[in-house]
Structure formats: structure tokens, C-alpha cells
Amino acid sequence: MSGLDWNTFLAILRAGLWEQELRLPSEPDAAGWERLLALSRSQAVMGLILKGIAQLPAEQQPPEEIRPVLRTMEEAFARANARYARVQGGLLSLLTDAGLHPVVQKGSEAAKYYADPSARQVGDIDIFLPDGEFQRARALFPDARIASDGAVVLVQDKVTIELHPRYYDIHRPARRLPAPGSPCGEILLLTAHIFKHVIGHGLGCKQLCDMAVSLARLEGKYDKKALRAALQYAGLMRWHRLLCSLLVADFGLDPACCLTGFQPVDPERLRRIVRESGHFSHHAKTKAATAGAFLRRLPFSLSYCPRETLATVRELALGNLLTRGK
């Protein structure tokens, strides 16, 4: 993939993400459009790219031979969204009818911050159950498997569901972290969640768009000093700065939406990971593949979040030993 393809892809992605009109310096030919659409699939941002294409003037729309591909993408995207909504609605009804209080989290929660939530490409459904409710929820799905981090994992109608016993994927006492579901908490959660993508299966533009729109829509609705303190306590401050630097440079985030006094750093190292790995669902998700990716990125993860990286290694090792013994 050429730098020109990537830059054109990002321009269209930003237009879709922020719903802004766009005129490209030069439009791709048919082969270029095919590469861009393939990239939108591997980065899990098909809906946003379709939105971005709609922001182009008539003379820069994809050529006629690409229209069937676009229609196929639109139809597949709509079917996936409908299936996801059906599964999530049924799951939440089941849990609430059982007297539980499920909290939608991660990307599923970030969808509400998009100008058009239906433009976000669906993935897994992540649900947090508050204290005392996780075991009751687990009993509703006796055939589900238990992941190495303790989450209950099942699949319904091709949609993966994960029920989590803790809100944060952070190895710090929860009582000293922001309240689950609070604006500050959502930003901290996404910061940690995206880091786990980087060191594991891979990171795509989808998660970065989640973070960008969350920061933009939550601007002015939380205490930035409190977020800074939480990031420092969690050992995620240096990583958060790198993440925001990439969002400002490539995804159109206003620097004012970052922490007070934000000073960007060169995001090239993270940009390269995103370009090379893409969204994890388009790659092998075997334990061997994940372990290989984790080891390759160990120098990166240790340089930005050493404490969280080492804690994750310990947790995964212990979790694998426990699940192997069952």
C-alpha cells in the first residue's frame, strides 16, 4: 500500500467521521478505489468510508465499475448492524429481566458519540456486570467458555459476546479509579482498551475513531485534572499522550480536546503499527498468533506502559494455567 493510498484513505475517513465535505487533490482510479475499499475492511471502518465517499463532489465519486462493490458493502454492512442490534437487544433484555444491571462498555458504548452511530462498524458486545452480579450472569450461560482474563465468552448469531467481571482492564484497585460509565471513566477505559489491542491482536482505525469521537463529544464534560491523575495512577500517561498525538495528526481531533497543556509527540511508531496490523478480526486469533504479536511488540509496550504490560503477562500466564487445568 502506497503512502498516497493511505493518505487518501485517511482523508475520506475523516470526512465520514466528522461529516465534513471533502474534495480530494486527485481522485483514485478503479484499482485505487478497490485498494481503498479493501483497506476500509481490514481497518473495520467500512461505514465511515461509505459516509466519507458521500461527502465527495459528484465528479469525484467512484467510477461506475466500482458501484456494484459499494452496493455489496452497503448491504453487508446493514445486515451486520441489524444482526448486532438484535443480539445486543436480546442480551440486555435477558440480563435485566434476571434483575441484573448490565453496563455496555468499550466500542459498543463509544458508538453513541458518533454523529451517526449506525456508521460505526459493529464487532464484539462487551458488557460489565457490577459487584455481585457477574456470577449470576455467568450462570445464565453454562456452556460459555471462560477467557484467561476471567471474562465469559459466547457467540450468538455470529456475534461474540463478552461478559466482564471488572469495568477496567487495568491492574489497579478499582476503588481508586473513576466511576464506571462516567465521562472520565469512559476515556480511561478506552485508553487502556486500545493499548491492549496494540500489544495483542492488533489495532485498527476503528478503535482510534472511537477514541477520537469520545474525546470530542466529552470535551468540557469531565475534569481533566482528574483524568490526568487517573492516567498517572494507572501508568498510562505516556501512552495516552502518544495516542492523542496520532489522533490529532491523522484523525482530525482538535488538540483542545486533549489534556490541558497537551504537547504532541511523533506518532510514527504507532502509525506504523496501525498500518501494518489493522483490526484484529482480520487476522488469526489463535493463542500462538496472539503470543507472537505480543512478543514482537514487547519493546514498544514496555517503553510506554511497563507496569501494565508486565501485569498483563502475569495475568495471561496465570489464566492460561487455570483454564488448562479445568
Where are these regions (language model features)?
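Conserved NTP-donor binding/palm subdomain of two-metal-ion nucleotidyltransferases/polymerases, i.e.
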Residues: 1-123, 129-326
